[in-house]
Amino acid sequence: MCATPVSPTPLPSTTPLTLRWRGSEPYEASFEAMRTFTDERTADTPDEIWLVEHPPVFTLGQAGNPAHLLAADSGIPLVKVDRGGQITYHGPGQVVAYLLLDLRRRKLMVRELVTRIEQAVIDTLAAYNLAGERKAGAPGIYVAPGPDVGLHAGAKIAALGLKIRNGCSYHGVSLNVNMDLRPFLAINPCGYAGLETVDMATLGVAAGWDDVARTFAERLTANLDGSPAAVAQPQAGVLTA
């Protein structure tokens, strides 16, 4: 376990933050929508967080090595994208949060943003009596050692990758809730051979996607804006924090 980065307590923000529930959506549709949103935003465009669940897809970061896809005949499409990081898998039962933020307006450095996203994951896991931890040099969140996690200590439960364009972020973070984990065996997750990937259900959490998505949205809002605003149950449409 590495030391927890120290991040200043976020102050209540006056910057509007909109939470959008996009439902189950093909990855390519979300990817193109993120790029379009970022290209077209102005200095006055409110920041947004999108909550999404994707059909099965592998995504490979802009500097990613295709050799980390170990089974090219898996039947799962591979999409090359412009985020940082290597290869990961998205699929049903995973909460994906895309963060479309104006970092200059929020006076956020990229490292601080990553720290706050990671803390939101840790806080979300804690709400379900799970302990998560960071690993130095390996963005994302991993299962902390404990009496109830057995051999899953050190397994990755959340992956993170961002793109910064003109001072604005897109892409984001994925949290494994209740998934078919077998596709992760077809890759070196995030470029690490033999890295175990786990979900909350495997660790004994019975909560479903909607419940975890709502909790995660609350924790993201609290870590970004400094106020634990209540977030309504995810549903089609717009939720404003």
From Swiss-Prot:
List the PROSITE patterns hit by this protein, alphabetically: BPL_LPL_CATALYTIC (PS51733), LIPB (PS01313)
GO cellular component: a single term: cytoplasm
Answer yes or no on keyword Lipoprotein: no
Question: GO: which molecular function terms?
Answer: lipoyl(octanoyl) transferase activity
Q: Name one GO biological process term.
A: protein modification process
According to UniProt, the reaction catalysed is: octanoyl-[ACP] + L-lysyl-[protein] = N(6)-octanoyl-L-lysyl-[protein] + holo-[ACP] + H(+)
InterPro entries recorded: aa-tRNA-synth_II/BPL/LPL, BPL_LPL_catalytic, Octanoyltransferase, Octanoyltransferase_CS
The cross-references to Pfam families, in alphabetical order and at most eight, read: LplA-B_cat (PF21948)
Recite the UniProt keywords alphabetically.
Acyltransferase, Cytoplasm, Transferase
Q: In which pathway does it act?
A: Protein modification; protein lipoylation via endogenous pathway; protein N(6)-(lipoyl)lysine from octanoyl-[acyl-carrier-protein]: step 1/2
Location of the active site: C190
BPL/LPL catalytic domain boundaries: 43-228
State which Enzyme Commission number(s) the record gives: 2.3.1.181
Q: Where is this site: Lowers pKa of active site Cys?
A: K156
Q: Where can this protein be found?
A: Cytoplasm
Q: Any further remarks? A: In the reaction, the free carboxyl group of octanoic acid is attached via an amide linkage to the epsilon-amino group of a specific lysine residue of lipoyl domains of lipoate-dependent enzymes.
Q: Which family does it belong to?
A: Belongs to the LipB family.
Protein role:
Catalyzes the transfer of endogenously produced octanoic acid from octanoyl-acyl-carrier-protein onto the lipoyl domains of lipoate-dependent enzymes. Lipoyl-ACP can also act as a substrate although octanoyl-ACP is likely to be the physiological substrate.
What is this protein's name?
Answer: Octanoyltransferase
Species in which this protein is naturally found: Paraburkholderia phytofirmans (strain DSM 17436 / LMG 22146 / PsJN)
Q: Which gene encodes it?
A: lipB
